[in-house]
């Protein structure tokens, strides 16, 4: 009996302490002018609920507090905005005290010169450097020929397979395609070591920044260190060779006639930026496009007809040209609709550099603002039957330029690699739908937050078309 009373007493003390901590943390962020909302626990905030409940957490908070509310996510006090007009203002006004505000784990792992982290003149330098690598001329003469050759050879390897994990295949496809464009003709051991480190880096970028052994954050930092070592060795090897290279790394290292000269650290961060920014969007969009096309035979029929028409006009092994890809109107519509419905990217983060008034509220300096676009993608006022896969809605080009369209970012941070990603996904779909039929094995769980991900893989049975 005595032991029971002690246990009850301890439990009461713990509950009281937890309640006091929650109240104390809430009071810390209760200031005049702040939006409504809850802040959760000290340090951790509401990160656990956010990551576990995902869209349901956001939806419930929106119902309680409206489209502009406060929380504490990934180690920082954060304002969440689901208002399309407010989002447009936030994304277009970087010069007015709003700069990129990505989680500390992402900044630490992707590098201080990463284009998503810098602003002002540094951002213009890194963005200009990237855009020079993916200009229309570069796309036509260098990038697309490499992408086309890679996709054909990569999908050739599936001829003898009956069942594939399309999640695994598209992740490797996206990584290897980007790495081929950055630095071609790499030795296999180098590629394998780089790939292992890169996959660990990706996991670490969305983690609580606690540097302890075994944490995703520590693994991500170690993976980035390994990637830096590999890139240093590769760059030194190229300098020692005296050869001229026409891949992305070659242009980044070029000194003469380079309008955007970068330091070695900036080059390494640029390489990681290119790999990271395209990896998840290209791989996941490719996987989800196949799922939606499988579930909507009419859309698959129209997409396949578009691609078979190109093949009929070409010799058997003739590659796709840039004008071919630009002419794939329905394919582009499928890519946009897949990105919208699957919500490959849930939103973007900004940070205030001074106290700001937004939407009638006073936002303190140093707070992050999460422009959360998932709910906007499903807004019935913006998209008719928003939960239905309907690529035909995008055949009206004007939809891409609407203020409510955040599929590829917006404002001054509109994704600079958007067209490169579309080229890669279009090429993949071209060679897949003209070579294979497929059906889902079934039974695979598909998570949609914080990343679109199948924990045990997403399996397809394929056969020649």
From Swiss-Prot:
| Residues the record lists as binding heme | 415
Q: Where are the transmembrane segments?
A: 2-22
Q: Which cofactor does it need?
A: heme
Question: What InterPro entries does the record tag this protein with?
Answer: Cyt_P450 (IPR001128), Cyt_P450_CS (IPR017972), Cyt_P450_E_grp-IV (IPR002403), Cyt_P450_sf (IPR036396)
Q: Which GO terms describe its cellular component?
A: membrane
Induction behaviour: Repressed by brassinolide (BL) treatment. Induced rapidly and transiently in seedlings hooks but fades out of hypocotyls after exposure to light.
How does the UniProt record describe the way this protein sits in the membrane?
Single-pass membrane protein
Under the GO molecular function aspect, what terms does this record hold? heme binding; iron ion binding; monooxygenase activity; oxidoreductase activity, acting on paired donors, with incorporation or reduction of molecular oxygen
GO-annotated biological processes: brassinosteroid biosynthetic process; brassinosteroid homeostasis; megagametogenesis; response to light stimulus
Matching entries from PANTHER family are given as: CYTOCHROME P450 26, CYTOCHROME P450 85A1
Query: What role is this protein assigned?
Result: Catalyzes the C6-oxidation step in brassinosteroids biosynthesis. Converts 6-deoxocastasterone (6-deoxoCS) to castasterone (CS). May also convert 6-deoxoteasterone (6-deoxoTE) to teasterone (TE), 3-dehydro-6-deoxoteasterone (6-deoxo3DT, 6-deoxo-3-DHT) to 3-dehydroteasterone (3DT, 3-DHT), and 6-deoxotyphasterol (6-deoxoTY) to typhasterol (TY). Required for the initiation of female gametogenesis (megagametogenesis).
Q: What is this protein called?
A: Cytochrome P450 85A1
Look up and give the organism this protein is from: Arabidopsis thaliana
Q: Which gene encodes it?
A: CYP85A1
